[in-house]
Each structure stands twice: as structure tokens, then as C-alpha cells.
Amino acid sequence: MKNFQDKIKKLVPEMRRVNQIHFIGIGGAGMSGIAEVLLNEGYQISGSDIAEGPVTKRLAEAGAKVFIGHQAENVAGASVVVASSAIDDSNPEVRAAKEARIPVIQRAQMLAEIMRFRHGIAVAGTHGKTTTTAMISMIYTEAKLDPTFVNGGLVKSAGKNAHLGASRYLIAEADESDASFLHLQPMVSVVTNIEPDHMDTYGGDFEQMKATYVKFLRNLPFYGLAVMCADDETVIEIAPQVGRQVLTYGFSEKADYRIEDYQQTGFQGHYTVVCPNGERIDVLLNVPGKHNALNATAALAVAKEEGIANEAILAALADFQGAGRRFDQLGSFIRPNGKVMLVDDYGHHPTEVDVTIKAARSGWENKRVVMIFQPHRYSRTRDLFDDFVQVLSQVDALIMLEVYAAGEAPIVGADSKALCRSIRNLGKVDPILVSDTDQLGEVLDQIIQDGDLILAQGAGSVSRISRGLAESWKA
């Protein structure tokens, strides 16, 4: 016990009275990362989730006590309870914790406590934050700085989404979906872009969302640094309000770290970054798309400003294998009508879907793009309906799955049938609605052609479905 208390006192001095930490929704990407870091710091970790999966199994094998299902008795012995943003006050574990006077906090509040005693680098934005966080983490690792990192998705090069390092550096994805990133007080903040999403959090008011980002950036100390995308109109609009040092990056001629001469061949991207001092750095990436060049340049800017050598930056970016479910190639397969490539991608916002399609078009100009799209949440489908119609009309063939509700009740006019109808009326592509995913393989075999690139797109169960499809095609 003495060794445990000494360790806690050293790493997180103010949490020395905390022994057991319970996570409700421990299987989620963001929650599991923090749980894993704290488990490795020596805390007793327990947690619950509605279903067993690879993440819960891994945590259990590492020493966490994992419950499947939410029950009041699961919080017994906890010093504090960390609740996922998907968990509300009606959850039996939340109710039991409050009745027992156990503190119930958000994920970001726990992340903030871990960051408090470290040199924090927080990455926020509507799109690209998971990949950018992963890239920064790998650069610092390549530079032998042994950072702690907590990411919202798998860092493929590391084989995990979180790591407890021995240095003072903590690199973390910052979550704007519930505005909980306001708890964080980093030394460096990155904002990749700002677009309307999760608008229920902001009362449907985009101005409120922008103001919240400004508050997040003002959490930087006066000597901190904001690294912001020059290509995003909203990001540039709020930059003068930050009141901290700001450096920009992007394709824009006004960017401090400027991208030039981008070229893509298959999965590989080449470009040059012109730095504020005029230095020119040639970058090689093995992940496709201009959006990944932006992510990599944000990571490069952070690393350069913190004094990391070019050799480490370029080696890490060249070796970067991507983040989980970001243009993730599942394989090439021989089907009755020819050979096809299957790719899984997490993008579920129109902008994310758009850049994925563009990456596919740029790297594989002669291939048809066949998309399997699963809308994520009725509210997002409603709020961005017209944008989805325009973006999804860019593909050569479209299979639409039913909306992945993520706990939401259906909204009239915001379902997959309505999307299909509006896309069909636009006249560019004739979507096929597949309500029974067991029939997906059969439907695909009827429409695919030799050389097709098939994109399985969305944040819900479409990844599991597409990976099951890949396994069946291997047989």
C-alpha cells in the first residue's frame, strides 16, 4: 500500500485519497483510454458497459474489474465515478453513486486532472482530431520523449489508443461534443476546424459553439500556444478573439506553416511545408488525402514549435499507419464480377464523407467509388440533411443502410428512406436501401464491377458489418 500511495503522490499528488475509480461506459474509446492510463498508474479500476468487446476484454486482462450491464452494486467501493457523455442521471450506477455521496464526474474532468501536472497538448475540432492526436503522439514517441497519450481512436502504430509515458508530456483528444473540453488547461491547443455538429449541446446556436471554442483556447496560459487551421473560415474568424499566441497551418497562402505541391499516388501523399522562417520541409505520408496533409502539418507545427528535430518529425509521419477506422483498408477480394478493394472509414459528417470520397478519387482515379453508407443519429441526419444529399450524390454507386440511432428516437423525414428519395431526385446516383444487412453481400455482388473501390462509411455498426463481409469474402 505504501508503494501505491507513493506512486500516486508522485504522479497525481492531489488524488492521493482516491483508490478505486469506476467508469460507466468503460468500453468507449475515450473512456477506455483514460481507464488504461490510470490502471497503469496503479489505481484500482472498475467499469461497466452494455456489451463485451475487444476493449473491455483487454482492460479486464490488464487488471480492471469489468461488469457487463449497468447495476447499482457495480459502484461499490468506488472513490469516484466517471460517466461517459452517453450516460444520463437515470442510469442506476449514477443514481447509486449519488445516493452514496460518491462524486460523479465527466470523462474530461478526469482527463483534466491527469493533465494538470503535465505539459498538456489538446487537439480539438469537428474533424481530424483523432488522427492529429495520433500523429503528434507518434512524433513525440519517435523523438524519445515517451509521452502519455489518450486518443479517441486506435493509434495503429502503437497498437492502442492510450499509453502511460514517463515524461511530462500528455497529448489528448479534446471532446467538443458535450463542451467538456472546457475542463482542460493545456499548454498547447490545436483546432483543426469548426463546423455545426452536436448542436443539441449548444442549443442549436452555432455562435454559441464558436464562443465555446474561444473559451477553450483561452484556457491556455498567457505563454501557451494555439495552433489553428488557416483553411477553415470559422477558425480564422475566432482567432483574433483568443488572446494567446496563434500560429496557423494549411494550404492558404496566409498560413504560417504553408502546404505546397501536394500530390497523391494511391495511399501515399507528398508535399512541402514552408515554415514561418522560410525553411522548406518535404513530407512523405502513407495515409491518403489532403485532409491528412492538414492533420500532419498541424502535428508538424506543434512539434517544430516545441523544438523537436525534423528527423524525428519526418520519420514519424512517414511511418504513420493511420488511426483506427480512418480509410482503413480491409483487403482486396475476388468477387464474381472481378477484383475489388474494401475500405472502412469512420467519417459520419458530410465534410468527413466528402474528404474521404476526394481521397479515393485522387489516389485511385480509374476506380469506381461504391459507398455503403450508414447515417449516424437521426438528429445529425435532420440537421445536415441537404449536405448529406449533395455529398452522397458524388459516388458512382450507393448502398444506404438504416440509420444507426445511437439511442435516439426516430425523427420523421430524417431516416434513410428520406435520404434515398432526395438523392434519387437529384438524379446523379440511384441509391439502394438495404434494411437487412444480412443481404448486403448479395446486393453488392449484383452491382460491383472489376476494379471497384468500396467505401464502408459511418460511425455506427457499419464497421462491424464491413469487417464481417471481409471475413466472409476471404473464405
UniProtKB/Swiss-Prot annotation:
Class of enzymatic activity (EC top level): ligase
Gene Ontology BP terms: cell division; cell wall organization; peptidoglycan biosynthetic process; regulation of cell shape
Localization terms from the record: Cytoplasm
Positions contributing to ATP binding: 125-131
Family annotation (InterPro entries): Mur-like_cat_sf, Mur_ligase_C, Mur_ligase_C_dom_sf, Mur_ligase_cen, Mur_ligase_N, MurCDEF_pg_biosynth, UDP-N-AcMur_Ala_ligase_MurC
Recorded catalytic activity of this chain's protein: UDP-N-acetyl-alpha-D-muramate + L-alanine + ATP = UDP-N-acetyl-alpha-D-muramoyl-L-alanine + ADP + phosphate + H(+)
Xref: Pfam families: Mur_ligase, Mur_ligase_C, Mur_ligase_M
Family, as annotated: Belongs to the MurCDEF family.
Protein's UniProt name: UDP-N-acetylmuramate--L-alanine ligase
Species of the source: Actinobacillus pleuropneumoniae serotype 5b (strain L20)
